[in-house]
Amino acid sequence: MNDYPILLIHGTNCRNDGKHHYFGRIPQMIEEQWKKCYLLYGDAWGTIAHNCELYRWQIKRILSSESCEKVHLIAHSKGGLEARYLVSTMEFAPFVASVTTLSTPHQGSRTAAIWEKRPLRLHFIGRFLEMYWRQRGDLAPDVVSVVHSLTPAAMAEFNQNNPDVPGIVYRSFGAVLAQGHRDYGMACLAHCLTHWDGETDGLVSPDSARWSKNHQLLSGVSHRDVVDNRRKKSHCNYDWRRFWYLLLEWLAEI
């Protein structure tokens, strides 16, 4: 059994700071069941490379303060790509025991490709989002670059440049929404994206979330509820406490 610290990496259009951080009640639960849990702080609309530069120094400080050899990375949505980039491109593999990704678009999003074909709209919305998130702490938001990086073509290149590193345990989880789900925002998005991406959790399709041989599909849960972002009952069979408890048990055996 190991007790390496657990580091949580957020996705796009959210930050890990502020009164209502990204992972809901999960950090408190991990602290109760585990030794240490840390939130990593990146830009809401930072590129993968930019956010990983921010994470690099945070991880080094954690390794030093905890006097530990390695950490576990648990990352949601685009954060899963950043976790893989840290290990492969930034050569953090010696300091990472495992990488767990939750609803991460490893194979890209057709919806992102559609947005890229509408550059005027994308630039207009991007300017608004960048202004908004700069006021909330983003250092270098870049919506257009982030959207491009999530297209299937860009992700194919990313996957080629960031293969799994031997010695690190990878695990991925995808999700798909159920009818009657109470996360109405994600349910609406899922309906809108059906034409391009098929079934999704509201943003990411199960096929895109698949990575590594160790993969599991969560049925009836939304993109946000995987990480308790809404802090509400998901009105399905998904029990976030049980899911995270089992995940911690699995990490303890690595």
Predicted regions and their residues:
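Active-site catalytic motif of lipid deacylating hydrolases and related acyltransferases
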Residues: 1-70
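Short, solvent-exposed loop/turn segments at secondary-structure junctions
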Residues: 12-14, 44-45, 80, 105-107, ...
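A structural micro-motif
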Residues: 4, 35, 69, 94-97, ...
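Glycine-rich, phosphate-binding/catalytic loops in enzymes
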Residues: 23-26, 89-92, 116-119, 189, ...
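Serine-dependent carboxylesterase/thioesterase catalytic core
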Residues: 10, 37, 53-159
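C-terminal catalytic-base region of ester-bond hydrolases, centering on the histidine
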Residues: 163-254
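Hydrophobic/aromatic beta-strand patches that form the interior of the parallel beta-sheet core
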Residues: 7, 38, 100, 171-173, ...
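Soluble or luminal CAZymes and related metallo-dependent hydrolases
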Residues: 22, 51-54, 146, 150-154, ...
